[in-house]
């Protein structure tokens, strides 16, 4: 399957235009259609301004260019929901996308997507109900070979006990989720938010942060992550836009 993150329509030209994001995404989607993955996950910040209907409409229009046979799952980022993650922003997001978390199984692996902005913003009621849902999904997936998590925010960037900052989930919440990851043997989390590639781990739980598809802030060029899931392992590689392979050998 393929993960891409932070297309953030409108960021490149400070909300004046999204023509560059459209051009990049159309190239990426042509490559995705050629690869024909089992599914695609977009880990948040679909647009730069979650209140800009033109940005949202263009993102959705471009995503419809992905072949209908390829399921596409999206998750909210802080730009989609606002930093405060208000009731209004959550409601508007649900109206646009229909869901803010997901779970499904493919070939005996369980894939789970979280609304991480509600955790970051400490929206207690919403976060608590999602946490209860998450634990039930994890508990019911113990016969699967893998449990793989997706979210916009990574739980942490470098160290599991690192200080709270804009890039991670606050410590008081983070420990709860890391304990769940250990208890239910979650192997991987794929996240975004940082606009650069990074990897870290906690016990047997691996966090992979994927660069922005449109607005990189680090040394890596724009690109996508291709993930291959085997019965005994999960393997992934990042490819910049000009180096995406024409096929993937399992």
Language model region names:
Residues 148-155, 187-197:
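Histidine-centered catalytic micro-motifs
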Residues 6, 44-45, 77-78, 114, ...:
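Active-site glycine-centered loops adjacent to acidic/histidine catalytic or metal-binding residues
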Residues 42, 141-159:
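Short acidic, glycine-rich surface-loop motifs adjacent to enzyme active sites
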Residues 1-56:
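N-terminal active-site segment of His-dependent metallophosphoesterases
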Residues 1, 40, 111, 147-148:
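Hydrophobic beta-strand anchors of alpha/beta hydrolase catalytic cores
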Residues 231-250:
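Acidic, His/Gly-rich catalytic cores of divalent-metal-dependent hydrolytic chemistry
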Residues 53-146, 164-167, 171-186, 199-237:
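Extended active-site neighborhood of metal-dependent phosphoesterases/phosphodiesterases
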